[in-house]
A protein has these predicted regions:
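Helix C-cap/helix->beta junction micro-motif
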Residues: 2, 75-76, 125, 184
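Glycine/proline-rich, positively charged
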Residues: 15-113, 117
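Conserved short secondary-structure transition element at the edge of the structured enzyme core
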Residues: 73, 134, 163-201
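Glycine-rich beta-alpha junction loops
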Residues: 10-12, 87, 107-111, 133-140, ...
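N-terminal binding-site loop/beta-alpha segment at the start of enzyme catalytic domains
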Residues: 1-8
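Conserved, mostly hydrophobic/aromatic
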Residues: 6, 39, 48, 61, ...
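Glycine-enriched alpha-helix->loop->beta-strand junction motifs that scaffold or abut catalytic
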Residues: 77, 95-102, 121-130, 200-201
C-alpha cells in the first residue's frame, strides 16, 4: 500500500449530474463523511492519499468543505485533498482553512487558458496542477477524423472539437504534432503527453 498512491473523488452523488441535475451535487459535511467511508470500503484501504472535490457544490461554502477535509486528515482517512474545476476565489478561501494539495482542470494542446490563470495561482499557493483530459478526450490521438460516426449517446458527437469546424480549426496544430511524431517514431498521443509533462507547475 505504501508504494501505491490512491486518488478518488467526492461531491457528485448521482450520475444524473452529467445530464444537468445540480441536485446530484452534495458536499455537505454529513454527505462527505458518508462518501469517504464508502470509498474506503470499496477501495479496500484505510486511507486515501488524495481526495478531490469532483465539482463545486453551490450549497456548500468552501470554508465548510475545507473544515471537513481537515477533520478527515486528522482522523487519518485522507492524506491530502484537492478540487476539480473550482474558481479562483473558491480555491483561495478553502486553501486558507486547509491546504489544497492539487487542483484539476482541463489542460492540453487545445486548452491552454490556464497558463495565464491557474498556473500562476498554483505557483503562488504551492499547489500542484493536475491536467484533466490531457489528450483532449482523445482528440489529440488523431484517431477521430472529420466524418467519424459516433454511437448514440457518445458525448464526442456534441463537442465542437470533434466536429468538422473544430478539426479544421486545429488542423495546423495536428499537422505539427504528426510531424514531430514522425521524427521521434512516436504516436501523436505520446507527443502530446511529452509536451504536457514539461509544463509547470
Amino acid at each position: 500500500r505504501k508504494e501505491t498512491v490512491i486518488a478518488t473523488k467526492f461531491g457528485i452523488v448521482d450520475e444524473s449530474f452529467f445530464m444537468g441535475n445540480e441536485d446530484a451535487l452534495n458536499s455537505s459535511r454529513t454527505s462527505i463523511l458518508q462518501q469517504v467511508d464508502a470509498s474506503l470500503k470499496r477501495l479496500g484501504t484505510d486511507y486515501i492519499d488524495l481526495y478531490y472535490q469532483h465539482r463545486i457544490d453551490p450549497k456548500a461554502e468552501p470554508e465548510e468543505v475545507a473544515e471537513t477535509m481537515q477533520e478527515l486528515i486528522k482522523a487519518g482517512k485522507i492524506r491530502s485533498w484537492g478540487v476539480s474545476f473550482a474558481p479562483e476565489d473558491y480555491i483561495r478561501r478553502a486553501h486558507a482553512v486547509c491546504k489544497i494539495s492539487a487542483i484539476e482542470n482541463m489542460y492540453s494542446f487545445v486548452a491552454r487558458q490556464d497558463e495565464e490563470t491557474y498556473f500562476p495561482l498554483c505557483e503562488e499557493l504551492g499547489i500542484t496542477y493536475v491536467s484533466a483530459c490531457p489528450l483532449a478526450k482523445g482528440y489529440l490521438s488523431n484517431r477521430y477524423p472529420a466524418g467519424t460516426q459516433y454511437r448514440k449517446g457518445d458525448w464526442r458527437a456534441e463537442m465542437n472539437l470533434f466536429k468538422k469546424e473544430g478539426i479544421d480549426a486545429n488542423r495546423n496544430l495536428m499537422d505539427l504534432i504528426m510531424e514531430f511524431a514522425g521524427r521521434k517514431r512516436a504516436t501523436p498521443a505520446q507527443i502530446a503527453l511529452a509536451w504536457e509533462i514539461t509544463k509547470k507547475p
